[in-house]
Amino acid sequence: MARGPKKHLKRLNAPKAWMLDKLGGVYAPRPSTGPHKLRESLPLVIFLRNRLKYALTNSEVTKIVMQRLIKVDGKVRTDPNYPSGFMDVITIEKTGEFFRLIYDVKGRFTIHRITAEEAKYKLCKVKRVQTGPKGIPFLVTHDGRTIRYPDPIIKVNDTIQLEIANSKIMDSIKFDSGNLCMITGGRNLGRVGTVVNRERHPGSFDIVHIKDSQGHTFANRLNNVFIIGKGSKAYVSLPRGKGVKLSIAEERDKRLAAKTH
């Protein structure tokens, strides 16, 4: 009988979005417990070693993080397996670099560099709104934050713009048709579009219909839809491609056009 927490993660069982090669060993770094789920996070070791190539081995990553050089959402993190996730801001002050973890249209975490100005805030999806002891209202976000005394107009599935330095709500975006959203799960992971309408299915999953800037429409479950902007104006900068998924034929034409130039 297995007792206690699992401590290992086999490489073949690691999320495909980490893009680890099959033959690179038996195990993968198992993310520590933290604000994001295991399958929806990216450990710092993979970000620094496999993506940014700032280190060659796990022990080199440990040496980097133990110098307190890496901040996630404004807090120094010294755990190489710390699970950073969607919308987290990773700061490397020594090199003056700021990154926001965002999915590309293939559903992988991309290296998305941002300005120092944009690194001051992040977007959080509201997962729960309720009243705590002594009647204090609070909300819980997708990255496990609890914020007390929020604005009463903020409801579940809305998005809040959070100032990282002091965890204050700067602005909120309602979950409304016509607003810009990004898909955070399922086969449309990483796509960006505007909400067309929401089908309510009591007792089952609500379905949201979305249309991207190319006019393609697709549908997704409500809990995979993350509002990122009012109207067509995104509150965060988007990676290359702007979240538009091309069909296989369109991708081929684009590659051929790039070759001929």
Swiss-Prot record:
UniProt lists the family membership as follows: Belongs to the eukaryotic ribosomal protein eS4 family.
Q: Keyword rRNA-binding, does the record have it?
A: yes
Mind telling me which InterPro entries this protein's record contains?
KOW (IPR005824), Rib_uL2_dom2 (IPR014722), Ribosomal_eS4 (IPR000876), Ribosomal_eS4_C (IPR032277), Ribosomal_eS4_central_region (IPR013845), Ribosomal_eS4_central_sf (IPR038237), Ribosomal_eS4_KOW (IPR041982), Ribosomal_eS4_N (IPR013843)
Record-linked HAMAP family: Ribosomal_eS4
Molecular function, one GO term: structural constituent of ribosome
PANTHER family associated with the record: 30S/40S RIBOSOMAL PROTEIN S4 (PTHR11581), SMALL RIBOSOMAL SUBUNIT PROTEIN ES4 (PTHR11581:SF0)
Domain S4 RNA-binding span(s) in chain numbering: 42-104
Look up the record and give one Gene Ontology term from the biological process aspect: translation
Q: What is this protein called?
A: Small ribosomal subunit protein eS4
**Species annotation:** Carabus granulatus (Ground beetle)
Q: Which GO terms describe its cellular component?
A: cytosolic small ribosomal subunit
Q: Does the keyword RNA-binding apply?
A: yes
Quote the CDD domains the UniProt record gives.
KOW_RPS4, S4
